[in-house]
Amino acid sequence: MRLDELELELVLDPDASEKAFERACILGALGRNDEALHAYYEVLRRNPEHFGALNNLAVLLTDRGSQRSALHAYEMLVERHPDSAIAHTHFASVLRDAGRSDEALAHYERALAIDPTTASAHHGLASIFSERGDEQAATRERRLGYTHRPVTFGRFRGEGDPVRVLVLGVDGEGNIPTKSLFDDRVFAIASLLVGFYDAEQALPPHDVVFNAIGDADRCALELTAANALLAHTSAPVINPPANVLVTGRVANGERLGALEDVVAPRFAIFPRWLLDRTQAEAALEASGFGWPLLLRVPGYHTGQHFIKVESRGDTATALASLPGAAVIAIAFLDTRSQDGNFRKYRIITVDGKIFPLHLAVSRDWKVHYFSADMVERPEHRAEDAAFLEDPRGVIGERGYAALERIVATLALDYGGVDFSLDTEGRVVVFEANATMIVQPPPSDAIWDYRRKPVDQIIAAVRSMLRERGLRSLPG
């Protein structure tokens, strides 16, 4: 075995940094990540400038949720290799994930100044511009990044034959975050961008298709195009585009709100020209809305471009702060508990089964797990842990049965539901679609109770993919 050979060679030549680097890479490929981490540090002890060791170390730290350490490793990479477009691009991506978008933008631009063909830097800029509501600039960067590469192939690190997964996505926001879901020791991933791929061209070889286009409000045209592409395959499809297409906020409000023991707020989508050129307040009132109400831009998540309008007179100012060509109005439902806190639950559904992901508790109406009062409040984490341990017991039989009806109605192989409970124990649905992210918890020990539930979800997705992929093989 090559690993044994390298360890013997390093005994004879302990300063051989390239052999030490090869050993670290093999350990990583075998999934022995703790040993790989230590091995990369050993490479850097021998050669502090080693590009591959710095980069791979940062990737490992990122995958472990050690964001601060990963940022430090990438910072060293850029300092020691200032003329590397790859170094600047990787550093920028982690900066963006850390919410430092101005710094990320500067490093993406530096990468493109070094090498204008760096596709991933264009992709990163597109994401930043999109987050800021500048869709014209975002579209320009996407086209620069994707036009010549509509299909990319991931590295397979396993042994034997992989399960080949064709992932359908779009050039920008609206995709299901899949980074944590695929194991490159089991699956070989081909990622295809709908909209840049010739529909008459044969699809890349695959055993199963994972439709990662998850946002029906933002990606209706792409979902329709994906449906047409799938006419060229007989392989099983995870999340058929037709099923995703009917999960927009307005459509969900109507069909889920009709279910027993499910409450959905009123939703309506308005073109901006209607609200900007007429009296917005009158248009909203004519559609049955009062104040307070919520306004959000379609296609954005995690609280972006999502605001509460307290009174009728605040409407024009609120609208002026939002980008985009359309706005969704949402009736505000006050779901505060008796203690004054808002509680938002999230479940993930995989192959029809319900998995609890988190319970966020916050004084703020706009509840998001990692922005909620979870770090400072151990009693909130205790509630979260209780939900993860026994979701049916926490939600109650009435609410859990309503969740099962929601999951059956969605008919998604992979998706999620964000919801609260009203005083009668009914489910109040905020969002139900395929875009829900399953994020491994940070490395801090206070989140240890969350690791097993997250691992169970990821394992369920991988099991579903493997089973569907193997089912399509001959014999």
Task: Please annotate each region the language model reported.
Residues A408-L412, L421-G475:
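C-terminal active-site "lid" helix and adjoining low-complexity regulatory extension at the edge
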Residues V151-D161, G169-L275:
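Conserved N-proximal alpha/beta basic substrate-recognition cap immediately N-terminal to
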Residues A29, D63-R64, D97-A98, E131:
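Register position in tetratricopeptide repeats
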